[in-house]
Amino acid sequence: RASNPNSQTGPTIGGQVTLVISMHGRALWPAQQMKLTHWNRLADENGFIVVYPAGTDFPRKWETFDLGPDLERDVRFISELIDMLQSAYNIDPARIYANGLSNGGGMAFVLSCNLSERIAAVAMVAPAQSLPSGWCANTRPVPMITFQGDADPIVLYDGGSMGGPFNPARLVFPAVQGWVAAWAQR
């Protein structure tokens, strides 16, 4: 499920390198995420490793909408990916970051709770997440930054449900300001 990490050739801190995990949105592929983000160029210029794991099924997606075995499987996959990369490269365990677009941003959000002991910080663009308020019992704070436009037709800024092929289950997304404020207070 994971694409190959970039070939890291730049400077390191104490011989250890940073790892960035960049996750695609629903119905996208790792190669599209790589092209959208330009992380490879930045990684090669600044000496860190980036990897673009793939979600499951078709269309490709991360299971971020329901608490349950599918979500746990995706979290376990990312944890095992980190283990594999740490065994192959000298990854600094204090500098592992997750980011994503839309559904991949929702997965980064999930990792900020479920892998908070391994993830240093998360960055999300239009994160699609509809987990219930208070779903995360973990109290370790993980820094996050999120970007969301108020004209997004899929992840509605003021919350609600959009229909169509990208939301067949009619998921209801919370208002962005509300869930971000609640997350900051937890």
Could you describe each region identified by the protein language model?
Residues 1-6, 10-97, 107-110, 114, ...:
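Serine-hydrolase catalytic machinery in alpha/beta-hydrolase-like enzymes
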Residues 42, 114-118, 182, 186:
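Alpha-helical structural signal in soluble globular domains
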Residues 64-69, 165-171:
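Active-site rim elements
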Residues 87-88, 94-142, 153:
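Primarily recognizes the serine-hydrolase "nucleophile elbow" in alpha/beta-hydrolase
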Residues 146-148:
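Short beta-strand/loop motif that positions the catalytic acidic residue
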Residues 151-153, 186:
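Phosphate/oxyanion-binding loops and surfaces in catalytic or ligand/nucleic-acid-binding neighborhoods
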Residues 153-158, 164, 172-175:
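Conserved alpha/beta-hydrolase "acid-adjacent" motif
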Residues 169-186:
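Acidic, glycine-rich loop-and-strand cores that form catalytic or ligand-binding grooves
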